[in-house]
């Protein structure tokens, strides 16, 4: 089976629409083959991909060095360059992550429900692949393998569009993946990386490529996600912001609250599951507010608060209205005192992003109300918001976090990259 040449004349094609249409058609054909591939064959393909990534490490690192050099010359931030940079250890980790996906249970062909109708019809609901998943990402080249492997495990084909910063590295990784698929007897076109930096290619992907793309997953900053959500003609699995709250309610143990707050905010400040707002119930503010604020400040976190929070510590600066709706992705948190559970829920509804919100309390009735009434993809009771992660949920890995209401919500793992069909078994029944 031929391996897709990602450095072919496609990259020089004058007609971008023709280029993208061809990618879409090949992905649709490959997706049909992947949908019928046995679980064992898919797993062999993923293990072959992991081995090929290891074999191709020198080539991947050479291309990565070119990307990093260009990023440095362009004056990109150290944070972006760190996300972009690979070394031997990171390449090995990419290969290992693909192998872990191979070890997950097959999400395809599972019987989700079965029932018999009074007329004798036997009806079952069975999980099936989505088809073709378009993944648009920015500077993290590991997304090429992570997202591609999850799509393949779920019996899908993937069209990957890397950001210009990571294009060379992503191309090398995608080439290794296509070679691994071909060695396992699977279609190399099940993984295709768009071979152009032209941003118009993103717009074409968002149209669905004439019905060839079934869902789009953006992995990147706010501007990318906003564009995808505004322009996409196909379903999108994404979240715009991660404005996550920690609500320290009446009945909260102070030691637990301190530990969970610091972990939710400071374990990693730059991820979407990091807490951005602290809400302290007025019933426990006298005993809990000051030590919690001090713990944040002493850990290196700046605090922007309401009048009550400012009164608790002179180092607290005044919060603006915008602070309650800001995803800092940094060692900054907004904090305020709320008058009870209803006020906390109302604040989250007005200012949150429906991502992940936590309540800390030993009051099981209050916790039950919070978990039921807060309209977020993930709600936690006495647990850190940073558990908002597919790996922590036991999904093995995730392609992203979705906060929409249709199909996938929360961590999007292999199970969420499937849909279902109904199989109806009869014995000659006709409808009266």
From Swiss-Prot:
Keyword vocabulary terms for this entry: Amino-acid biosynthesis, Cytoplasm, NADP, Oxidoreductase, Proline biosynthesis
Gene Ontology MF, one: NADP binding
GO cellular component, one term: cytoplasm
Pathway(s) it belongs to: Amino-acid biosynthesis; L-proline biosynthesis; L-glutamate 5-semialdehyde from L-glutamate: step 2/2
GO biological-process terms attached to the record: L-proline biosynthetic process
A Pfam family reported for this protein in Swiss-Prot or TrEMBL: Aldedh
Family the entry assigns: Belongs to the gamma-glutamyl phosphate reductase family.
Primary role: Catalyzes the NADPH-dependent reduction of L-glutamate 5-phosphate into L-glutamate 5-semialdehyde and phosphate. The product spontaneously undergoes cyclization to form 1-pyrroline-5-carboxylate.
Protein name per its UniProtKB record: Gamma-glutamyl phosphate reductase
């Amino acid at each position: 089976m031929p391996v897709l040449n990602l450095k072919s004349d496609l990259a020089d094609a004058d007609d971008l629409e023709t280029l993208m249409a061809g990618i879409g058609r090949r992905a649709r054909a490959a997706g049909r083959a992947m949908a019928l591939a046995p679980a064992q064959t898919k797993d062999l393909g993923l293990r072959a991909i992991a081995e090929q990534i290891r074999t191709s490490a020198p080539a991947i690192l050479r291309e990565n060095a070119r990307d990093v050099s260009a990023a440095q010359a362009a004056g990109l931030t150290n944070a972006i360059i760190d996300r972009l940079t690979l070394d031997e250890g990171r390449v090995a980790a990419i290969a290992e992550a693909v192998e872990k996906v191979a070890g997950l249970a097959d999400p395809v062909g599972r019987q989700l429900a079965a029932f018999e109708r009074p007329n004798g019809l036997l009806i079952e609901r069975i999980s099936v692949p989505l088809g073709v998943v378009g993944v648009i990402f920015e500077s993290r080249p590991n997304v090429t393998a992570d997202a591609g492997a999850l799509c393949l495990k779920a019996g899908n084909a993937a069209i990957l569009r890397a950001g210009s910063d990571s294009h060379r590295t992503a191309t090398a990784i995608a080439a290794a993946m296509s070679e691994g698929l071909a060695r396992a007897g699977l279609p190399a076109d099940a993984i295709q990386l768009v071979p152009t930096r032209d941003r118009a290619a993103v717009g074409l992907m968002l149209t669905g490529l004439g019905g060839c793309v079934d869902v789009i997953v953006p992995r990147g900053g706010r501007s990318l996600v906003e564009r995808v959500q505004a322009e996409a003609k196909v379903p999108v699995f994404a979240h715009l912001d991660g404005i996550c709250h920690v609500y320290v309610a009446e009945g909260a143990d102070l030691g637990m609250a301190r530990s969970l707050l610091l972990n939710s905010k400071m374990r990693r400040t730059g991820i979407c599951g990091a807490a951005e707002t602290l809400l302290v119930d007025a019933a426990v503010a006298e005993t809990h507010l000051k030590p919690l604020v001090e713990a944040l400040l002493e850990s290196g976190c700046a605090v922007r608060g309401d009048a009550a929070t400012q009164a608790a510590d002179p180092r607290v600066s005044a919060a603006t209205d915008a602070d309650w709706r800001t995803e800092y992705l940094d060692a900054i948190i907004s904090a305020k005192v709320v008058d009870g559970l209803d006020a906390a829920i109302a604040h989250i509804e007005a200012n949150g992003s429906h991502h992940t919100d936590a309540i800390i309390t030993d009051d099981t009735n209050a916790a039950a109300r919070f978990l039921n009434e807060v309209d977020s993809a993930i709600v936690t009771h006495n647990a850190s918001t940073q558990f908002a992660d597919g790996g922590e949920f036991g999904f093995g890995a995730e392609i992203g976090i979705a906060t929409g209401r249709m199909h996938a919500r929360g961590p999007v793992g292999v199970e969420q990259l499937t849909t279902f069909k109904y199989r109806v078994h009869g014995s000659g029944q006709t409808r009266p």
